[in-house]
């Protein structure tokens, strides 16, 4: 797979910006987590099957891996969601890279985050407009570092643009049971 890689240096970390032609991600090797991902919903009605697909580790980038997700409450949270790119198997497989995966609380990933992802696809269908999304992974306050070295995000900010309307949502990295995705709109 071809990647365009731009190296960024900051005071506290080493990060890479990677554009794989489907989404763009800034990835922190220090946190072993993405810092942000940008994408445009491509296939809101795609039917490609995820069956048999698993996350893969890209070459030359220190990422999280399966060990970070064992025996805990964190899912491999797609930031550029697989369902928005299920045009075909090849496109879908690009979303299964660990550069596109964050340690996301299972209650968030399977709850209101998933419902907001469905809204993105529904909006692309209903309005017939491009739906552009930026997901920012938050590392604020006291952070948890797993024994494997990966840092657990404190939350996620999702910025959705449909035409000339932009809305921002901020989710803590915790269970969202008993809430609605609209509750997380950033006012």
Question: Where do the protein language model's features map onto the residues?
Answer:
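Short, His- and charge-rich active-site/binding loops that engage polyanionic ligands
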Residues: 16-75
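Domain-level detector of nuclease and nuclease-like folds
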Residues: 59-187
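Sec-dependent N-terminal signal peptides
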Residues: 2-13
């Amino acid at each position: 797979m071809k990647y365009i890689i731009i190296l960024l240096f900051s005071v506290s970390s080493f990060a890479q910006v990677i554009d794989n032609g489907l989404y763009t991600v800034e990835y922190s090797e220090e946190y072993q987590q993405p810092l942000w991902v940008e994408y445009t919903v491509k296939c809101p009605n795609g039917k490609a099957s995820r069956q048999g697909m698993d996350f893969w580790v890209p070459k030359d980038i220190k990422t999280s891996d399966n060990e970070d997700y064992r025996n805990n409450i964190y899912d491999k949270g797609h930031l550029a969601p697989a369902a928005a790119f299920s045009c075909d198997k090849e496109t879908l497989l690009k979303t299964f890279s660990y550069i596109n995966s964050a340690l996301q609380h299972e209650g968030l990933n399977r709850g209101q985050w998933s419902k907001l992802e469905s809204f993105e696809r529904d909006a692309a269908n209903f309005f017939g407009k491009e739906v552009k999304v930026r997901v920012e992974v938050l590392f604020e306050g006291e952070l948890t570092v797993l024994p494997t070295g990966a840092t657990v995000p404190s939350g996620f900010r999702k910025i959705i643009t449909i035409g000339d309307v932009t809305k921002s949502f901020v989710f803590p990295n915790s269970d969202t049971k008993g809430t609605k995705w609209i509750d997380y709109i950033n006012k």
